[in-house]
UniProtKB/Swiss-Prot annotation:
InterPro entries: DeoD-type, Nucleoside_phosphorylase_CS, Nucleoside_phosphorylase_d, Nucleoside_phosphorylase_sf. This is Purine nucleoside phosphorylase DeoD-type. It comes from the Bacteria. Belongs to the PNP/UDP phosphorylase family. GO terms for cellular component: cytosol. It catalyses: a purine D-ribonucleoside + phosphate = a purine nucleobase + alpha-D-ribose 1-phosphate; a purine 2'-deoxy-D-ribonucleoside + phosphate = a purine nucleobase + 2-deoxy-alpha-D-ribose 1-phosphate. The record marks R216 as: Important for catalytic activity. One of its GO terms (molecular function) is purine-nucleoside phosphorylase activity. It comes from Lactococcus lactis subsp. lactis (strain IL1403). Phosphate binds at G21, R25, R44, R88, V89, G90, T91. Homohexamer; trimer of homodimers. It is an enzyme of class 2 (transferase). The active site is at D203 (proton donor).
Length: 234
């Protein structure tokens, strides 16, 4: 049965899925990387597709921006459609001098300014951590492909404009700031499924460097390749 936000029938979504924030990036991935891709969702413009990649059945779907949005879709994908492996492929802003525009960042753990997780844990901070097996595979896949990749802590912020002091955050070793991974990692722990965030640096908060919206939608293919290869890895 369809959910309030996903119109797919049972069986139309694979148990492995890529989750870009931008639904047009989901369409780009389906059109350029998947064979026999079929669209399973367009509710609220959040496009989703299922196809095959190197003979493996996989899906890709947009999530929108922020932890509330990705949490809605990830919850429904896990609880209603049986998805077991979810990899976010999105953009992030660097807060580290050694992490440059178009580099990849794999988030080993995600701090957050969001209060959503505190609804379940009001008395202490619950750590949002990626699935180590997926992280390890993604890192080695990226290295084998010769892609500049950093592994470390990231920050999932509720604010795109404003938010935590970038210099202070960077001094703590945080690699980048984005808006979704902590929520996805928390749901991974809650439902005992595999989750990971692979981000491309689209902006450098310290230097002011940036990429265009068209670049963010259409050219960050390294992240897509690493995400797909990790998704189908044994």
């Amino acid at each position: 049965m369809p959910t309030p936000h996903i119109e797919a029938q049972k069986g139309e979504i694979a148990d492995k899925i890529l989750l870009p924030g931008d639904p047009l990036r989901a369409k780009f991935i389906a059109e350029n990387f998947l064979e026999d891709a079929v669209q399973f969702n367009q509710v609220r413009g959040m496009l989703g597709f299922t196809g095959t990649y190197k003979g493996h059945r996989v899906s890709v779907m947009g999530t929108g921006m922020g932890i509330p949005s990705i949490s809605i879709y990830a919850n429904e994908l896990i609880t209603e459609y049986g998805v077991k492996r979810l990899i976010r492929v999105g953009t992030a802003g660097s807060v580290n001098e050694d992490v440059h525009i178009r580099d990849l960042v794999i988030g080993q753990a995600a701090a957050t300014t969001s209060a959503i997780i505190r609804n379940d844990f009001p008395d202490f901070d619950f750590p949002q951590i990626a699935d180590f097996d997926l992280l390890d595979k993604a890192y080695h896949i990226a290295k084998d492909l010769g892609i500049t990749t950093h592994v470390g802590n990231i920050l999932s912020s509720d604010l795109f404009y404003g938010g935590p002091d970038a210099v202070k955050v960077g001094k703590l070793g945080v690699k980048a700031v984005e808006m979704e991974a902590a929520g996805l990692y928390y749901l991974g722990a809650k439902y005992k499924v595999q989750t990971l965030g692979i981000m491309t640096i689209s902006d450098h908060i310290l230097t002011g460097e940036s990429t265009t919206s068209e670049e963010r939608q259409l050219t960050f293919t390294d992240m897509m390749k690493v995400g797909l290869e990790t998704l189908i890895s044994e």
